[in-house]
């Protein structure tokens, strides 16, 4: 089983490791599933890749392979959220160096959205890539993408409870699950653990974790 090589959008799972989310295999994060749920709702063909799959793709296909893939795209979306200290036994979250390199390789003009706590942190540290039609989402990446697909305009948006429920359901059977490297081959039959989001924010941010991201 494999994904379509002619998919119109590329969804890159940079892994989301934050105080309330693991996001690194054998877990699949909720925000990346919501994002895929948006594309499912709009009936947009897309290809899902983890950052580890992307690294393997670059090594296997080289610059020509990367260029061919990028030039076939109509859009790009990435979630990056590694903001807590820790060591990883399997997957490694995307770095800002890798993110910059990927952005440079994107065709000029195609819509691209980057979201997640790492993106917000990098932006606060001064990262403001100058590229047409690239948007750094500071609120809900999924809702921001949904608004763009409806209006062709970038605007920071937050999802409604109804959207939250719908995209969670669509994302549960999206390519973020069906084509996750922990499930998609006989050599990797699972398990794959769904992370579930039941709450946003934290009431203990004033006297909580040292690596708190809420303030």
Could you say what each language-model-derived stretch is?
Residues 1-215:
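Acidic, low-complexity intrinsically disordered segments
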């Amino acid at each position: 089983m494999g994904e379509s090589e002619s998919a119109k959008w590329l969804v890159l799972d940079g892994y989301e490791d934050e105080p309330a989310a693991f996001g690194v295999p054998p877990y699949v994060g909720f925000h990346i599933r919501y994002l895929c749920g948006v594309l499912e709702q709009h009936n947009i063909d897309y290809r899902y890749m983890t950052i580890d799959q992307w690294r393997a793709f670059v090594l296997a296909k080289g610059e020509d392979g990367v260029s061919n893939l990028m030039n076939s795209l109509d859009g790009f979306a990435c979630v990056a959220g590694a903001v807590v200290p820790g060591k990883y036994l399997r997957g490694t979250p995307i770095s800002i160096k890798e993110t910059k390199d990927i952005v440079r390789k994107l065709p000029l003009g195609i819509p691209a959205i980057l979201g997640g706590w790492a993106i917000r942190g990098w932006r606060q540290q001064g990262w403001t890539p100058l590229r047409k039609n690239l948007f750094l989402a500071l609120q809900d990446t999924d809702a921001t993408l949904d608004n763009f697909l409806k209006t062709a305009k970038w605007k920071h948006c937050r999802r409604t409870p109804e959207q939250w429920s719908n995209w969670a359901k669509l994302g549960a059977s999206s390519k973020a699950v069906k084509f996750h490297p922990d499930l998609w081959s006989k050599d990797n039959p699972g398990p794959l653990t769904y992370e579930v989001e039941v709450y946003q924010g934290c009431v203990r941010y004033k006297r909580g974790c040292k690596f708190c991201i809420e303030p």
